[in-house]
């Protein structure tokens, strides 16, 4: 047997092993939050686009939600606007939100659409404004002063929280074989435009469409235990316990809390996985052991 034949047989075996998982997700909706290091790496970006295209070809209905914090910061710097933060969160004034919308719904969104279209699929770029898909209201964030222990309200400007999601447009796109690529910008009933955290936006979308899976592509392998080993699966109650005992800490806390909120909205399972691994989406959905931490009810 030649080396070429052995390689071909190995590839065929991988495809055969993936079949039951493809059947499991056929006609199911998978929401993917695309962000982190993968967005700044050309090779990883192309691998991600190919994963999304393969999902669609396999009968899955993928919906992509993307972030863009670093790109927003770069654009603000180029335009001579200083980035301001309160309690670790970006303050978004009127001028800043216009730039945020330009970067997210314009530049980044269309780059992702182009990558997916280059793989032979039909992707379409949208934001919460399109089809009145998402309405937001001003986010209410509070912090506790460590010295006085007094809670104060942060004014983050035009930072919003999604409060209404209409799935009508997403359902139409699913039936038309198109792949929605969503930027986390949405209008408020007050007429203003709001910048929404991409994780929160993805969770709201996934809950509205009752997604089978919500995938968060991050810069870490998933949730780690105290020995820094990957935890393959957690229930909501187990995740809460790990937050309480400090095993889950720092920036992973809001990520896991968003996962829990999505499950409470009707998502069947949420996965935190490493977007720096090429084809991590396919590894998670179409292999036996997955690629990250799955959180279930």
From Swiss-Prot:
Keyword annotations of the record: Amino-acid biosynthesis, Arginine biosynthesis, ATP-binding, Cytoplasm, Kinase, Nucleotide-binding, Transferase
EC number per UniProt: 2.7.2.8
Gene3D superfamilies in the cross-refs: Acetylglutamate kinase-like
Pfam family, one: AA_kinase
Top-level EC class as recorded in UniProt: transferase
Subcellular location: Cytoplasm
Catalytic activity: N-acetyl-L-glutamate + ATP = N-acetyl-L-glutamyl 5-phosphate + ADP
GO molecular function annotation: acetylglutamate kinase activity; ATP binding
Family: Belongs to the acetylglutamate kinase family. ArgB subfamily.
Claim: Methyltransferase is one of the keywords in the record: no
InterPro entries assigned to the protein according to its UniProt record, in alphabetical order: AceGlu_kinase-like_sf (IPR036393), AcgluKinase_fam (IPR004662), ArgB (IPR037528), Asp/Glu/Uridylate_kinase (IPR001048), Glu/AcGlu_kinase (IPR001057), NAGK-C (IPR041727)
Sites annotated Transition state stabilizer: 33, 255
PANTHER family: N-ACETYLGLUTAMATE SYNTHASE, N-ACETYLGLUTAMATE SYNTHASE, MITOCHONDRIAL
Entry protein name: Acetylglutamate kinase
Function according to Swiss-Prot or TrEMBL: Catalyzes the ATP-dependent phosphorylation of N-acetyl-L-glutamate.
Predominant location: cytoplasm
Binding-site residues, substrate: 68-69, 90, 195
HAMAP family, per database record: ArgB (MF_00082)
Pathway: Amino-acid biosynthesis; L-arginine biosynthesis; N(2)-acetyl-L-ornithine from L-glutamate: step 2/4
Highest classification ranks of the organism: Bacteria, Pseudomonadati, Pseudomonadota, Alphaproteobacteria, Hyphomicrobiales
Cross-referenced SUPFAM superfamilies: Carbamate kinase-like
GO CC field: cytoplasm
């Amino acid at each position: 047997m030649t080396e070429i034949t052995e390689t071909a047989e190995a590839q065929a075996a991988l495809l055969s092993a993936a079949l039951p998982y493809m059947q499991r997700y056929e006609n199911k909706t998978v929401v993917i939050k695309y962000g982190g290091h993968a967005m700044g790496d050309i090779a990883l970006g192309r691998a991600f686009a190919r994963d999304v295209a393969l999902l669609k070809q396999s009968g899955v209905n993928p919906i992509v939600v993307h972030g863009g914090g670093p790109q927003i910061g770069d654009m603000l710097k180029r335009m001579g606007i200083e980035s301001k933060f309160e309690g670790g969160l970006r303050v978004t004034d009127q001028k800043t939100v216009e730039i945020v919308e330009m970067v997210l719904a314009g530049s980044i969104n269309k780059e992702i659409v182009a990558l997916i279209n280059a793989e032979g699929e039909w992707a379409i770029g949208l934001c919460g404004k399109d089809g009145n898909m998402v309405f937001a209201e001003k986010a209410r964030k509070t912090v506790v002063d460590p010295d006085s222990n007094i809670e104060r309200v942060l004014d983050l400007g035009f930072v919003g929280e999604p409060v209404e999601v209409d799935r009508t447009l997403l359902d139409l796109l699913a039936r038309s074989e198109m792949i929605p690529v969503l930027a986390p910008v949405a209008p408020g009933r007050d007429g203003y435009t709001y910048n929404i955290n991409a994780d929160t936006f993805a969770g709201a979308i996934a809950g509205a469409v009752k997604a089978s899976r919500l995938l968060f592509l991050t810069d870490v392998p998933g949730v780690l235990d105290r020995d820094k080993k990957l935890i393959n699966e957690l229930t909501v109650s187990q995740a809460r316990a790990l937050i309480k005992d400090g095993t889950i800490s720092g920036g992973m806390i809001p990520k896991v809390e968003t996962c829990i909120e999505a499950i409470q909205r009707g998502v069947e399972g949420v996965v935190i996985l490493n977007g720096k691994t090429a084809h991590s989406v396919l590894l998670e959905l179409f292999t036996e052991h997955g690629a990250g931490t799955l959180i279930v009810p």
